Amino acid sequence: MECSASAPEGREEAWISFGKHNNRVCLMETRGHGIVGPDPGTLNPEQLEQLRDFKIQTRIANEKYLRTHKEVSLLISGFFREMFLKRPDNILEFAAHYFTDPRLPSRIHMQLIKEKKGT
C-alpha cells in the first residue's frame, strides 16, 4: 500500500490507498505542524478491517526484520546509552556526530561478535 494522492487545495491531510479499488481516504488531518489524529469516520467497515490487518502485518514484518538485524537494536541502544550518559544540549548535533562516527561500524561489529560468543 502506498500513499500517492495529494491533499485538496487549502488542506493539509495524509492519504492512504486501500484495497483493489484504490479508494483514497483521509486518515489523519494535520493543522500547522501537528497531527490531530485518526478520523475513523471517513473509513467504511471494510476499510477499517483492511487498515487493522495492514497494521498487524506491518508490526509482524517489522518484528521479523528487527530479530534478523540485531545491529539495529545495538545502534539504537548504544545511541540512547551515550545520550543519557552525556545528556547533550543539542540532541540533533549529538545524533549527527554519533551516527557518522567512523568507528561506529566496527564497534557494532565487535558487539555482534561478542554476543555470538555469549550464546
Swiss-Prot record:
PANTHER family according to UniProt: RIIA DOMAIN-CONTAINING PROTEIN 1
Tissues in which the UniProt entry reports expression: Abundant in tissues rich in highly ciliated cells, such as testis, trachea and olfactory epithelium.
Boundaries of every RIIa domain copy: 70-104
Organism of this sequence: Mus musculus (Mouse)
Name of the protein in question: RIIa domain-containing protein 1
Primary gene name: Riiad1
